Amino acid sequence: SAGRLETAEKALDLMLEKDSFVAFEKAKNLDDLNKKRRKIQHEALEIAIQKAEDFKNDKVLVVADESFNDGIIGIVASGLLERFKKPVFVISIEGDVAKGSARSFGDFSASQAVQNASEIIIKGGGHDAAAGVTLPTSKIDDFRKSVNDFYDSLKLKNQLEKLLPKVDIQLEDFSPISVELFEKISLLEPFGNGNDEPTFEIKNACVIARQEMGDKNQHLKLTLSDGEREFKMLKFNAPKDFFAEIDEKVDVIFSLGLNEWQGQKNVEGQILHLERKCV
């Protein structure tokens, strides 16, 4: 959060601080900054969703606003992509210059879309799944048309299928999941573009408990059963269709996370995709 809203030096100062009392104050300041970032991020996402509705028929969503902080537009773009299941550019406006962050998937390359608009932008680049762009504010509408024309020129098929997370391991039940497995997977870090985190899928798991968390019940914790074992899974800012009912069967694609509390370690699932079956 320090790097997104101000400077990453604040986090570095905390790590280097030797005085415990000063370190505590610096940690508190960072925590306050993180809360501020979450508030700004949430407000920006709400505005972006409203603006996206005006362009809901576009193949590529391009939303812009003067209130967007360019430190969090990438996070907002990820939120829009998850909600609308389309490539997204979120643009912050500051006077005559605008800065955008893109998130994409499948065969639509965000960086190629930016390069295709080279005549109307100031600069830009990135990779297939994410890119950045700087352009004159007056050219935002032209940029929106350019990236949508580029999408149409590709004549893409089955894009939505490519939005689904890849599955590395198909599970019959939860028996292979353990802290030891999580620790072995952790040796493969850092994960990112070109080194994806391993994913798992289980089908027809039964929901035996559901907990909604957060100030707006936007976070979800499910306890699933394979018939013999139980396994908890989490999804922050979960889509509405992920909130399965008790006794409902679900297919879930997930990665692994570790929950440490009072010296106890427990593996939990991080939900990437959930498909509800029938009650």
Task: Give the location of each predicted region.
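Flexible helix-coil linker/hinge segments at domain or subdomain boundaries
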Residues: Y151-E161
